[in-house]
Structure formats: C-alpha cells, structure tokens
C-alpha cells in the first residue's frame, strides 16, 4: 500500500520547497502520513519523468531530461547515469533556476516565442552536455518544433561529435506514471 506523488520543486526527505507557489519547506509527507495509512513517497516531477523515460527504452545508459513546463518558464533537468538517478546534495541536482545563464538582450521580449525557446533549450543543452555528457537529452518544450534545430545551434558552440542524441517528446503522462511507480516501489 503506497501513494507515490510527483511534484515540481525541491523535494528532500518528504519536505517540498516551491517558493513561487508559497511552499517553503512544507512538510508534505508528514502531513499526508497523518491522514493516510499508506506509505507516502514524494519525488520531483522531472526526476520522476526521467526515471519513467529511462525505464521505457534500451538504447541509452545515460540520459538527461530537459523540461520547460510553462512557455517562458524556468524548467528543470533530470539525470540518470548507468541506471542511477542523480539527485545530488539536498536533491537540487537539475534545479536550473540556480544557474547564472546569460541570455540575449531582448530575451524577456522573445522568451515566449519559438526563437526564445530555441535559445533557452540550446543554452541548457550545452550546459548539460558540458557537465554530464549524457548519451541523449530528452527535450520537452512546446515551442521547439524539431530537435535538429537545437542540434544546429549547439554545433555553433561545440564539436558535433560531442553533442548527444537529442529527442523531443510531446507527452509526459506515461513517463511520469512509470516513474512514480518505479520510484515508489524503490521505497517499499
């Protein structure tokens, strides 16, 4: 008997921090455990999705998942290396909101356009590749039409041979469900 949840924000030992929605160290797991008899497992949404995607494929040992939920929003990254989910200290691995990335001067004007989405996605894919060098980066961004566009932009900054496979996906639900189940079962 288990309830497995997938939420945005930093999730560490059942405590959720998502400041833009007013959650600052919310003890959600303890609160839910008082109300329900089932074991409660809470994970970050991007980590849940990357786990589900990884489990549904056999081609890659190492993947990263770049997620921009809201057009023009900050997003997040999930990493799996050789089957291991990388959460980092205090589970903040992938919290790209803390990266000091510089964008073009007119980025605030274009961030909700395909041009702005391409700049955002390219810069974070370059960062992921430089730091983690996964076999593939899975991209979820509604304004990116083709992953090839991102690859062409990345080639302006790094050798083509360094660029991982880039895979754009359109739907998250199945990967989130698989990830919730797998991460929940790990805690049983």
Language-model segments: residues:
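Glycine-rich phosphate-binding loop and adjoining helix at the ATP-binding site
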Residues: 1-62, 149-161
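Conserved residues at the C-terminal ends of beta-strands
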Residues: 6, 66, 140
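Short glycine-rich anion-binding loops that position phosphate/pyrophosphate groups of nucleotides
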Residues: 8-11, 69-71, 143-144
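Flexible, active-site-adjacent loop/turn segments at secondary-structure boundaries
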Residues: 19-21, 94-99, 141
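Alpha-helix N-cap/helix-start and coil->helix boundary motif
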Residues: 25, 47-48, 93, 144, ...
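Glycine/GP-enriched mid-protein hinge/lid loop-to-helix segment characteristic of carbohydrate kinases
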Residues: 30-130
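ATP-binding/phosphotransfer module of carbohydrate and carboxylate kinases, centering on a glycine-rich
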Residues: 35-38, 103-188
